[in-house]
Amino acid sequence: MTKITRDKRNFKFETLQLHVGQEQADPTTDARAVPIYQTSSYVFRNCDHAAARFGLSDAGNIYGRLTNPTEDVFEKRIAALEGGVAALAVASGAAAVTYTILNLAQNGDNIVSAKNIYGGSFNLFEHTLPQYGIDTNFVDIFNEEQVESAINEKTKALYIETLGNPNSDVVDIESVAKIAHKHKIPLVVDNTFATPYLVRPIEYGADIVVHSATKFIGGHGTSIGGVIVDGGNFDWEASGKFDSLTKPNPSYHGISFTQACGAAAFVTKVRAILLRDTGATVSPFNAFLFLQGLETLSLRVERHSYNALKVVEYLNNHPQVESVSHPSVSTDPKQQELYKKYFPNGGGSIFTFDIKVDAQKAKDFIDNLELFSLLANVADVKSLVIHPATTTHSQCTEEELLDQGIRPNTIRLSIGCENIDDIIQDLDEAFKAIA
């Protein structure tokens, strides 16, 4: 009987999250765990070797701002889990989003974005990027006609989140991808809230996937980081809209990234140009912690999802709750359909609900929670809570808040991995305290 070699096996997600990037023990020390390479720089064998590294003709480490062996394992692992060809780890999720847009658009260009997105991304698109000549057309992502009409000859990307923040609206990735590709632009998907364990956007037509690794990937609220995953399927040359990728780049020896780097052209350019010039590098120690998080990602997400569905059911039947914004209890037939399509095993442990009180009482409810932590993060193993209108989305105007489904009595929950009875009891006590 012929033995199937390791590199030819079609390993499942749970196996990939443990092994990709370090299939064997460390060759120098025989350590099974991925070492932390806490170094700023690397020795070249000779001047020719150094020149080859800087010219990208020899793949390998140049300087700690650009590459690191610990980070390399993390990048390979997340790329495999998302089904991409390559990935780049950076210092934060915000850096991942910023680099992605700056790698696509320049002064005079625009992107089209769903309006129901993370408040930090909204502010980046609405206020910061316009200072550099990059505008954003915000749309109702569920209105295909509106999306189509927002795209023009200067549009360089369509941007969505798998699950809208903070209300967990499920976006039809496949449908939006078709619109993007019809106009020869890439679809960028922030998959932070879903994780590749629940949804792999590249399989539905996404071209670039970004994450805040701080959230589910790390999972324990200890580290800040982000990831950009290159799907490797977008034809940059056929598009004709991305000269910085296809034509000789004057800031890097005149190379064409599509010619030199093939399917991984996009993420290679981010590393070689943007990371080189602006330096939002993830630390080796944080990359190590993210690898630790990845090893239990599937287990944690299963528990998060189970607990979340129980909490949603509890809130949806509570007399003091006005509404729950979670696709599992949505009355919108389209949302029900999309939830079944993209989340057949459930999911969505970050969501909002509107309590039947005014803003002050909503804040009183939050202040009476004891198990939930009031902080500006999500997807921790511990349950978290926040008042979006006065925190994460406080920079938005009243109209922008309403557009994103955020009202003064809206509360966002991030359901953790505690015992479900304890989670519900904590919520119950807070409701009693404001009754």
Task: State each model region's role.
Residues 1-2, 14, 85, 126-127, ...:
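PLP-dependent enzyme catalytic core of the Aspartate aminotransferase-like
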Residues 2-68, 76-77:
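N-terminal "arm"/small-domain region of PLP-dependent enzymes with the aminotransferase-like
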Residues 2-9, 17, 21-25, 87-317:
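Conserved PLP-enzyme active-site core in the AAT-like
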Residues 25, 43-47, 235-236, 297, ...:
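Short, acidic Gly/Pro/Ser/Thr-rich loop/turn segments
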Residues 46-95, 120-128:
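Conserved N-terminal alpha-helix of the aminotransferase class I/II PLP-enzyme fold
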Residues 59, 85, 286, 290, ...:
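Short amphipathic alpha-helical segments
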Residues 163, 192-194, 329, 356, ...:
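Active-site beta-loop-alpha junctions enriched in small/polar residues
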Residues 301, 309, 316, 320-411, ...:
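Conserved C-terminal alpha-helix-loop-beta "cap" of PLP-dependent enzymes
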